[in-house]
Amino acid sequence: VDYVKGYGEIKGLEVAGNNFSESYLAIQKVIKTMRKERRPFLVHANVPLLNHHTSGVRMEWYRDDLEEHQKRDPLPILKNQLEESGIKSSEIEKIEKQVFQNVKGDFNKAVQAADPDPEELFENIFHPTPITEEKGERNPEGSAPTIMVDCALLAIKELMEDNPECLLYGQDVGKRLGGVFREAATLADIFGDNRVFNTPIQEAFIIGSTVGMSAVGCKPIVEVQFADYIWPGLNQLFTEVSRSCYLSRGKWPVSCIIRVPIGAYGSGGPYHSSSVESVLANIRGIKIVYPSNSADMKGLMKAAYHDPNPVVMLEHKGLYWSKIKGTESAICPEPARDYILPLGKGNVVLAA
């Protein structure tokens, strides 16, 4: 609890985690306060360790406080509290027997159940997407050539206009800067600070927060400022974001877009020029999009938004403005508002 004192907006509370009534009332109060004040809480529940820390090492080999921890077993404490409040011992025993029978019955069902089919390992990696065909005007008459960074910006602007659940957040994407590449310029002014906002310099939070945002019906578009910075967020991407659909048997995919400016450009040096696609490609459960021109950027951004799965949008910095010799072909006329380019279909530009 002392740890949170350095964070002004976070409150801390310590409770006896082995005391059911104290824990219940404390958590009830915390939830009520959180909903009213919209602030985070850290609850430190002090609990005994009644079993081994790991199955590989017996606790009596490395602990001399076993008896003290056994005295803090929450179940006997709860039984005493119930008896002191007037609940008869016979009623408590009846509940215990019923719970034991329920657990025993479920255990027997598990023992008698057939072994899982290994082929199921490959099911529910992704939720089906409604976007399967290219639609709309890719090259509408009168459309001016537009650089890739602007097509990304315009795509998100249109998405936010059409979808009130769409949010955009990350490092420096808010009002004052609008992204270090101006990839979010004007969006906070148009849609407000409650939909376009800055985050702490914390990639684990930026990526991990998409799980909760998606669960409550928002569609987060988040940005990791440079591909080089994605590593602190990789744990959240790998263990939570990419696996939610599989672990829920297809019920709860994390619907989000993670924008990642990538690659060498200008004077980025070794800490702002990395290419991380080979690492990301080995994470099952995420879709990776890597546009090579501005028209694809807009069409793929629209498809990524309507895809119910997590999509990592790799945006090469060298193609953002096409200032490097040889990248001029990345500039295309801006596609129409209704243009959408499905994910998962390669564009063959050269065949040997």
Regions found by a protein language model. Give the residues of each.
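Thiamine diphosphate
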Residues: 3, 122-332
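Flexible, glycine/charged-enriched surface loops at secondary-structure junctions
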Residues: 38-42, 89-93, 114-122, 166, ...
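Amphipathic, soluble alpha/beta structural segments
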Residues: 104-130
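Alpha-helical structural motif
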Residues: 26, 74, 91, 95, ...
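Glycine-rich ThDP/TPP pyrophosphate-binding loop and its adjacent helix/strand module
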Residues: 1-105, 109-112, 281-352
